A protein has these predicted regions:
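A generic "folded-domain core" signal
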Residues: 1-133
Length: 133
């Protein structure tokens, strides 16, 4: 399920909640996969993940779509694409894919995998592009 939001035509984003989490019995805050457009500084399609827990220090998050894998750097409970050059390919993979898997490690050492559906992603992306163009 994809939701899109627009804040005064300046910040627009897609937010998706996971359809599956492993392990499923963790006590954690809200977690989501996001794509954000920042109109004022002309930043578009910025991917990020909020996990609802603090990451292991200096750890990387692995985001996979089909056979494609991307590394995200972490700060507290958020992660962003480590190599901005891969952003266009990541978005292309999201448009063509069915699911995103996000693998991360908490500050306690717990390995966690969240799975997100990409149903409706292309339509939601078009909506935020139109709203924040």
């Amino acid at each position: 399920r994809q939701r899109q939001m627009c804040i005064r035509d300046r910040i627009c984003y897609i937010i998706s909640e996971p359809i599956a989490t492993n392990p499923s019995d963790l006590n954690r805050g809200e977690h989501a996969l996001m794509i954000t457009n920042f109109k004022d500084d002309k930043t578009f399609h910025e991917p990020s993940v909020d996990t609802g827990f603090t990451f292991k220090p200096k750890s990387m998050v692995e985001v996979s779509i089909g056979n494609s894998k991307y590394k995200f750097f972490t700060v507290e409970s958020r992660a962003w694409l480590a190599d901005g050059e891969n952003g266009k390919q990541l978005i292309k993979d999201m448009k063509n894919g069915a699911r995103v898997k996000v693998k991360s490690t908490s500050s306690r050492g717990t390995k966690i995998t969240d799975t997100y559906s990409l149903i409706g992603f292309t339509k939601a992306l078009a909506a935020i592009d139109k709203a924040c163009s």
